[in-house]
Amino acid sequence: MKHAIHHIHFVGIGGAGMSGIAEVLHNLGYAISGSDLSDSATLRRLAGLGIATHVGHAAAHIEGADAVVTSTAVQSDNPEVLAARERKIPVVPRALMLAELMRFKQGIAIAGAHGKTTTTSLVTSVLAEAGLDPTFVIGGKLNSAGANAKLGQGDYIVVEADESDASFLNLLPVMAVVTNIDADHMETYGHDFGRLKGAFVDFLHRMPFYGRAIVCVDSPAVREILPQVARPVTTYGFAEDAQVRALNVRAEAGSMHFTVRRSNGQSYPDLDVVLSLPGEHNVLNALSAVAVAMELEISDDALLRAFESFKGVGRRFQRYGELAAADGGSFTVIDDYGHHPVEMAATLAAARGAFPGRRLVLAFQPHRYSRTRDCFEDFVKVIGLADAVLLTEVYAAGEAPVVAADGRSLARALRVAGRVEPVFVENVAELPAAIAVNARDGDVLLCMGAGSIGAVPGKLVEMLQKQELQAQQGAAQ
């Protein structure tokens, strides 16, 4: 049946998931437009591709659109959404549009509380190295591709599946990975962990009867749902009973070296892997890609090449290099999206392994008052693992403030715990200057959070380079 959809408008096009879908549809030949509340590098990149972008929301922006796609961050009273409904233009949630894209290819969906973006990127890289030319939509920039989405010519599409709003239940993959299940985004599930686990079972049952579930049995909640999963399953992890298992794990110069043992009914040789990512959590992410490769009969050589040449993902342990410290030496800057205590603990451990013996400075912007409230004690414990801490006010992400779940309360709790004396920087715009004052020679600075702190490393680099240039000019006079 010939449809009449030619022009698709995205409300909130600056988000990682939205921009990726928009780019793939643009490359499929659709006329794409979009708007976002603020300007960003993403908007500018999309404009460079020929996509009409707007800063701010207005009813006029949807002129000529045959469908309007919305992100979960967009409210129902958004002027573009209201105008679309008034004109009887279909308003489509992001996940439904992603599901439409997946209908035309063999879908591989990556779900889980933590590690989705890196795992999706690793799986994509393995398929690309094997010559399968996948389409992908990722929640972060795949550095080797310079983008978070690409329209491939192959049979597969690799996507992140978002459980935060239960929208992953719209997808119909033929293969699904579950990296872990954790108590995050609990408001979506009525603060009922059983409902959250049930949603993951339902997600796996969105696959056809022949679909393959690839799950990490190191996650207790994943292990708990296994008896309910009525699909073929491959397990992975460090656990002795995992069918794809990592042994002899060691960190070397920012990479992970380990042996993969595979035992899912067929005879496979052990694989000695070099993964160009730090941290044991990334070893687990890589194991899921091994399981996908086994299912698709990808050669071990392609798998090993993909892991060793992996160039990482934007804002996932992203290195900004060495910057001049105030005491005359230099410090290393790393940017990371981690914003849940479990993610932060894994990233801090990875930093310890990659930079043994060095002082670890954590600059952290909490994300959402509800998460800060629900995970307050865990935040205190994990933040205290750093040697020095700079803490900002909570990035609200549209939420109203919650009493005793703000940045100052977290700073006070850290002081009471006595493990670290935090420097509280209320305005994130002042964080680069505070970092410059506190960073010493040999430090490793980790900027972490899912909010506006993502712009801090770039601004810090710009500020210190400007200061260095001014100093050189002053010395020359």
Curated annotation (Swiss-Prot):
<dbReference type="InterPro" id="IPR005758">
    <property type="entry name" value="UDP-N-AcMur_Ala_ligase_MurC"/>
</dbReference>
<dbReference type="InterPro" id="IPR004101">
    <property type="entry name" value="Mur_ligase_C"/>
</dbReference>
<dbReference type="GO" id="GO:0008360">
    <property type="term" value="P:regulation of cell shape"/>
</dbReference>
<dbReference type="GO" id="GO:0009252">
    <property type="term" value="P:peptidoglycan biosynthetic process"/>
</dbReference>
<keyword id="KW-0436">Ligase</keyword>
<dbReference type="InterPro" id="IPR013221">
    <property type="entry name" value="Mur_ligase_cen"/>
</dbReference>
<keyword id="KW-0961">Cell wall biogenesis/degradation</keyword>
<keyword id="KW-0963">Cytoplasm</keyword>
<dbReference type="InterPro" id="IPR050061">
    <property type="entry name" value="MurCDEF_pg_biosynth"/>
</dbReference>
<comment type="function">
    <text>Cell wall formation.</text>
</comment>
<keyword id="KW-0132">Cell division</keyword>
<dbReference type="InterPro" id="IPR000713">
    <property type="entry name" value="Mur_ligase_N"/>
</dbReference>
<keyword id="KW-0573">Peptidoglycan synthesis</keyword>
<keyword id="KW-0131">Cell cycle</keyword>
<comment type="similarity">
    <text>Belongs to the MurCDEF family.</text>
</comment>
<keyword id="KW-0547">Nucleotide-binding</keyword>
<keyword id="KW-0133">Cell shape</keyword>
<dbReference type="GO" id="GO:0005524">
    <property type="term" value="F:ATP binding"/>
</dbReference>
<comment type="pathway">
    <text>Cell wall biogenesis; peptidoglycan biosynthesis.</text>
</comment>
<keyword id="KW-0067">ATP-binding</keyword>
<dbReference type="GO" id="GO:0051301">
    <property type="term" value="P:cell division"/>
</dbReference>
<dbReference type="GO" id="GO:0008763">
    <property type="term" value="F:UDP-N-acetylmuramate-L-alanine ligase activity"/>
</dbReference>
<dbReference type="Pfam" id="PF02875">
    <property type="entry name" value="Mur_ligase_C"/>
</dbReference>
<dbReference type="GO" id="GO:0071555">
    <property type="term" value="P:cell wall organization"/>
</dbReference>
<dbReference type="GO" id="GO:0005737">
    <property type="term" value="C:cytoplasm"/>
</dbReference>
<feature type="binding site">
    <location>
        <begin position="112"/>
        <end position="118"/>
    </location>
    <ligand>
        <name>ATP</name>
    </ligand>
</feature>
<dbReference type="Pfam" id="PF08245">
    <property type="entry name" value="Mur_ligase_M"/>
</dbReference>
<dbReference type="Pfam" id="PF01225">
    <property type="entry name" value="Mur_ligase"/>
</dbReference>
<protein>
    <recommendedName>
        <fullName>UDP-N-acetylmuramate--L-alanine ligase</fullName>
        <ecNumber>6.3.2.8</ecNumber>
    </recommendedName>
</protein>
<dbReference type="InterPro" id="IPR036565">
    <property type="entry name" value="Mur-like_cat_sf"/>
</dbReference>
<dbReference type="InterPro" id="IPR036615">
    <property type="entry name" value="Mur_ligase_C_dom_sf"/>
</dbReference>
